[in-house]
């Protein structure tokens, strides 16, 4: 009995790889005809997803989210601000999405990634319209002091479905967030209580006596789908996004209420039946993500 032809196997692998690079769409369509993707996922299945809380020790709330290889690091810093005259009893949230060159070969040093401001706006609109955060919970002294929550999200690996992973990291960071203790000084100004003073007896009555968490409701989750001919691919990789142009992103909250629907472009119109299928896939995905978030929160040690 002869030995396996290793050179033949290697040659075959090289031919497949060459075909994939030269004719990427034909390569993918061969897999789609078998209802499978090159990474062995069924068309409607998302990639493995993980969450880690407290990833940034210096932040008031932080999380690391991974969907497949796509990786996002979210960190929240709280600062005291003067609220606007229009909303004297509300705080504010500022969101910035960053794509450093390390995240993708298409991002070049010195040139801001085109997707970054778009995703920043999508995140701001989604978190605002979902009603996840009651801005009144960020108020300290009516008309005088309120919290400004600065959320920065860094893309560490951009392998597709960036908005989905960014939103998940944002939701997880706000779930992990602990509002710092503050007090009024003799001049009537708000001061943060340092960690050293945290357990000490305060001469001035603190505005909030202990660290607290926000009450989150209607938490939004999203799923991006690629529409190609009669196929719908959930949670696309960067390679799939580059080959098949039409993408839609559905955002639902934890009660399956539609928060938003994004279709950034592409030549194919999203027909009603395709949209309904994407919404159905998103409902299933929301349950998965809610379970992942709940399990991560329950496994976290409370200080």
Question: Whereabouts are the PLM-identified features?
Answer:
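Polyanion-binding surfaces on beta-sheet-dominated domains and ring/shell assemblies
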Residues: 1-303
């Amino acid at each position: 009995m002869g030995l396996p032809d290793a050179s033949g196997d290697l040659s075959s692998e090289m031919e497949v790889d060459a075909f994939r690079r030269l004719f990427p769409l034909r390569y993918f369509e061969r897999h789609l005809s078998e209802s499978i993707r090159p990474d062995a996922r069924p068309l409607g299945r998302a990639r493995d997803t993980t969450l880690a809380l407290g990833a940034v020790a210096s932040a008031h709330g932080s999380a690391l989210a991974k969907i497949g290889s796509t990786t996002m690091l979210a960190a929240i810093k709280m600062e005291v601000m003067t609220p606007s005259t229009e909303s004297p009893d509300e705080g504010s949230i500022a969101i910035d999405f960053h794509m450093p060159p390390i995240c993708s070969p298409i991002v070049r040093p010195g040139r801001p990634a085109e997707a970054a401001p778009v995703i920043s706006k999508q995140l701001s609109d989604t978190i605002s319209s979902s009603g996840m955060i009651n801005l009144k919970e960020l108020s300290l002294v009516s008309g005088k002091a309120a919290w400004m929550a600065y959320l920065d999200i860094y893309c560490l690996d951009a392998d597709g479905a960036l908005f989905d992973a960014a939103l998940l990291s944002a939701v997880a960071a706000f779930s992990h967030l602990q509002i710092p203790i503050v007090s009024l000084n003799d001049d009537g100004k708000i001061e943060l209580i340092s960690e050293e003073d945290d357990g000490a007896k305060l001469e001035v009555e603190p505005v909030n006596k202990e660290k607290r968490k926000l009450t989150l409701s209607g938490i939004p989750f999203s799923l991006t789908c690629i529409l190609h001919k009669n196929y719908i691919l959930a949670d696309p990789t960067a390679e799939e996004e580059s080959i098949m142009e039409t993408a839609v992103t559905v955002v639902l909250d934890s009660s399956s209420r539609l928060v938003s629907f994004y279709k950034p472009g592409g030549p194919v119109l999203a027909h009603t039946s395709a949209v309904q299928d994407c919404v159905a896939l998103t409902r299933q995905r929301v349950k998965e993500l809610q379970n992942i978030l709940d399990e991560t929160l329950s496994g976290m040690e409370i200080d």
